[in-house]
Amino acid sequence: MAKSKSSQGASGARRKPAPSLYQHISSFKPQFSTRVDDVLHFSKTLTWRSEIIPDKSKGTLTTSLLYSQGSDIYEIDTTLPLKTFYDDDDDDDNDDDDEEGNGKTKSAATPNPEYGDAFQDVEGKPLRPKWIYQGETVAKMQYLESSDDSTAIAMSKNGSLAWFRDEIKVPVHIVQEMMGPATRYSSIHSLTRPGSLAVSDFDVSTNMDTVVKSQSNGYEEDSILKIIDNSDRPGDILRTVHVPGTNVAHSVRFFNNHLFASCSDDNILRFWDTRTADKPLWTLSEPKNGRLTSFDSSQVTENLFVTGFSTGVIKLWDARAVQLATTDLTHRQNGEEPIQNEIAKLFHSGGDSVVDILFSQTSATEFVTVGGTGNVYHWDMEYSFSRNDDDNEDEVRVAAPEELQGQCLKFFHTGGTRRSSNQFGKRNTVALHPVINDFVGTVDSDSLVTAYKPFLASDFIGRGYDD
């Protein structure tokens, strides 16, 4: 039986009173068909598949996680209480009648399984790998929802890519990055930048036609971006772009089918177009607030993105305003840098470094940040956007940082053994479900897998519990 942790976490100061509750939370430690001598030794990542299967007769909703450990990738079914993840009020017209002919809602008709049972179907059963990336350590995975050719892409620690398909255990396409003199051990494990040169990343365009991946070339001179076909000839390298003056481009994200940005260790975001010359369209320089460690772009709107720093600072931006500032010469007659201002500035408590950022795929205003401690912060920027609505233009008052923080931090999750602070060890260990709003999966270094959905202050008030 999975362990229930309904007492963990605390919601942010969005409204009061704000309960410290979960709508659902389940955890379990997988068992494996092959012997694993030291589970802590293996790198772990996870991502969700997008399929959801409701079963009204059982009162359940089934979806699945893709979980990697070393070179092995597993699929883990997650069975959830339907009532928790489905809004009965949206479909009242389809309510059934009872035997007396009286109308009754699905809430009354649908069983409500106990919380904490999401992994009961796999609890105690040895897992067998769905896919194997032989000889590699998986560092990131992405599910390909609408691809006819492949089911998922996995990236290894050395920057290689592999495409996997259901029912086939080995990769169907590979982009291999060979380990040679340019990627010798002493270069990958740089003494001047420990561990940083091992960082690589990839992202898939909105239409799934193109992959962009970033990596170090191993010489500690410049990082590399590779634009790769994911349509007609998956795995074919279309173009290679060198990013001068950067050792590592540690994050890449698409904004749409062609526009993407890379985030480098020189604290500069560069915005590119896959169809144009090998120079960025424009840049955003962030020399303050510590090292620029992560960023993500919204998948609901093409314009919003968030940056995170080693000091725990988080900034929300509008790409249109950033681009416009590069052409505005009003205050730059003497060659000054562009004045590029963020929409909002937030922070992790205690200076907890920002190691990962995940924009919601179901909401234009929500995103999640992951701290170096492993803590997960849930943010909703609706309050900030409503203050800057055009209808309120004449009465806009800039919110104080504490006010903005209290209104936008809607939930805070502390999970399992996520206590060691390793800047690059926590990337890709938290995943937002692409269909179920606010549903999160996490994996800890000891392989503890947790799935949870917060019970938010707005939900609490909406159900009549506020005073």
From Swiss-Prot:
Residues 87-100 have a biased composition (Acidic residues). InterPro entries: WD40/YVTN_repeat-like_dom_sf (IPR015943), WD40_repeat_dom_sf (IPR036322), WD40_rpt (IPR001680), WD_repeat_RBAP46/RBAP48/MSI1 (IPR050459). PROSITE patterns: WD_REPEATS_REGION. Pfam families: WD40. GO terms for molecular function: DNA-binding transcription factor activity, RNA polymerase II-specific; histone binding; transcription corepressor activity. Residues 1-22, 84-121 are annotated as: Disordered. WD repeats lie at residues 244-282, 287-327, 349-389. One of its GO terms (biological process) is positive regulation of transcription by RNA polymerase II. It comes from the Eukaryota. GO terms for cellular component: cytoplasm; cytosol; nucleus; Rpd3L complex; Rpd3L-Expanded complex. Keywords: Meiosis, Repeat, Transcription, Transcription regulation, WD repeat. PANTHER family: WD40 REPEAT FAMILY. Present with 3750 molecules/cell in log phase SD medium. This is Transcriptional modulator WTM2. It comes from Saccharomyces cerevisiae (strain ATCC 204508 / S288c) (Baker's yeast).
